[in-house]
Each structure stands twice: as C-alpha cells, then as structure tokens.
Design a protein with these regions (language model features):
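Exported/extracytosolic protein signature
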Residues: 1-186
Length: 186
C-alpha cells in the first residue's frame, strides 16, 4: 500500500492465557510483521542500426534506441519519469521521440525531450506519470533516434543510459539495462 505497508499481527491461541495485548510484556504479545508493497521497475534499452549493415555502425549513420519500462512491483506508481541524455559523438534526430507510438514534442530549442525528462505511462492507463502494477498493458515504450557524427573516428564507442524515477515513492535514477548483454545496468 502507498501508506508504507500493512502490519500483520501473529499471536498464539487467545483461549490460552487471554487475548493478545501488543502493549503488554506478557506472553500474549503478537509478533508483528510489516508487509511492504512498492513499485519496482524493469527498464530495458536496446539499440538498432538503421542504415547499412545491421551489425556494424559507421560514422554518419542513424542509431535507434528503444526503451521499455514496466512496473513489476506490487503497487501502482505515479510521478514516473524517464531521463536520457543524448550520447557523446551523436546528434539527436529532431522529431524522432515517441511514447507508446505517439510523437513527443521536442524541447523548444530542438533538443530531445528526454534530456530534461518526460512523464511516462503505459497504454493501459494514459495518465502521464502513472505506471500501474499488475495491469495487462503496463509496458511503456520510448523510442528516439540519433545520428553518429560523420567525423567520428573508427573504433569510437557510443554509449547511452536511460534513468527512471518515481520520486513520490523514493525511487530515483534506476538505470536501464541492455538485455542482450550479461552486464547489469549497462
């Protein structure tokens, strides 16, 4: 529950020695266990080469990032945002950002809207920033493109990371992970 959980009290037979008394010091004190519920996010990010050889990225080519965010926790979340800085040695492709297939306007200066962060939601609930748990359609999909600078030297590594937060729940900067590698949070 959003209130921090539910307390479950466990005690012995109330017919023996009387009813449970959590304030007393006798053998009828219940053992209390706090049941916690909270949102928990699974954030995957993959890249796809859009030009030429799908296995080789060259200078001047376009790279597409696809990020999926799912609340796999036991509680709904509100105020969920994603932030993603454009990787070094690339330029954002104007107008390429979508959330669940719907265009997201660029920042006023033409930058990616993800640089400053945007509220996200899954198609199951169109409320901005809401990610429900246990919904059948609770997977948000964010897509954007970048172009590798034409003068980038051969061997340059293009690296990028997205971060998801739900500040109302004390969740900040959970990094994305590329599920195609064994390295966590890469």
């Amino acid at each position: 529950a959003r209130d921090g959980g539910t307390t479950l009290a466990i005690w012995d037979d109330p017919n023996s020695n009387g009813p449970a008394d959590p304030t007393g010091a006798d053998d009828e004190n219940p053992t209390q266990i706090l049941i916690q519920s909270a949102p928990l996010f699974d954030i995957d990010k993959i890249s796809t080469y859009l030009d030429g050889d799908p296995n080789v990225l060259l200078a001047g080519e376009t790279l597409r990032y696809t990020i999926t965010v799912q609340n796999i926790g036991t509680d709904n979340a509100a105020g969920v945002e994603i932030v993603d800085q454009i990787p070094a040695n690339t330029a954002y492709v104007a107008g390429s950002t979508t959330l669940n297939g719907v265009a997201v306007p660029d920042a006023a200066d033409g930058r990616s809207p993800l640089v400053d962060g945007i509220p996200i939601n899954a198609p199951g609930d169109p409320t901005p920033g809401v990610m429900n748990a246990a919904a059948t359609d609770n997977l948000a999909t964010i897509v954007f493109d970048v172009m590798v600078y034409p003068d980038v030297p051969d061997g340059t590594v293009i690296s990028n990371q997205a971060f998801v937060s739900a500040v109302d729940y004390g969740i900040a900067d959970i990094p994305s992970d590329d599920p195609r590698t064994a390295v966590p949070d890469d």
